[in-house]
């Protein structure tokens, strides 16, 4: 059994996959995750090249359809370690703006004991798919039920400043345990 849990807020939503305790599933390995985010058009995007080893890249501004053409030039190949996975792969948080002026942000929250998420773009259909960072052996995660994935978050607003002021990501993380 798997539960797909959604939490919806005024400024967006989060979703995650939950695996309850069950007789037929105790330990399992995550090979891939195929969460998809379908865009409505060729939006302007502010993005970093998808790289397993570093986030020390410069932010790029292009249309979604232009990511592939810009990708090789966008990567800082002088970093001591570079591990890109696709010519249309980007890091989260990914910020976009539609032709109508709507801002969209895709990210994650409560990422604990699970691989971090990048996004791989199908640049013909403008669909992003989650792309998890593997460990040294190529696995994306070793899980034991009951367990869950991080939240996959989508924030929307007609004002880019709202992306910084929203509490959506904070609300999806566990409360601080430090007293």
Can you describe what each PLM-predicted range is?
Residues 1-178:
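N-terminal accessory beta-strand-rich subdomains and adjacent acidic, glycine-rich linkers
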């Amino acid at each position: 059994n798997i539960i797909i849990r959604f939490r919806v807020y005024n400024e967006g939503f989060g979703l995650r996959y939950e695996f309850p305790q069950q007789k037929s599933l105790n330990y399992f390995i995550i090979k891939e995750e195929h969460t998809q985010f379908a865009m409505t058009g060729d939006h302007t995007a502010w993005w970093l090249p998808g790289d397993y080893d570093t986030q020390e890249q410069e932010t790029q501004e292009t249309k979604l359809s232009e990511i592939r053409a810009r990708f090789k030039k966008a990567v800082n190949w002088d970093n001591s370690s570079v591990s890109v996975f696709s010519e249309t792969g980007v890091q989260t948080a990914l910020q976009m703006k539609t032709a109508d002026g709507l801002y969209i942000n895709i990210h994650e929250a409560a990422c604990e004991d699970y691989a971090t998420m990048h996004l791989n773009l199908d640049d013909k259909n403008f669909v992003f798919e989650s792309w998890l960072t593997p460990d040294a052996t190529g696995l994306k995660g070793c899980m034991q039920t009951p367990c869950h994935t991080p939240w996959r978050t989508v924030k929307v607003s007609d004002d880019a400043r709202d992306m910084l002021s929203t509490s959506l990501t904070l609300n999806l993380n566990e409360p601080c345990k430090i007293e």
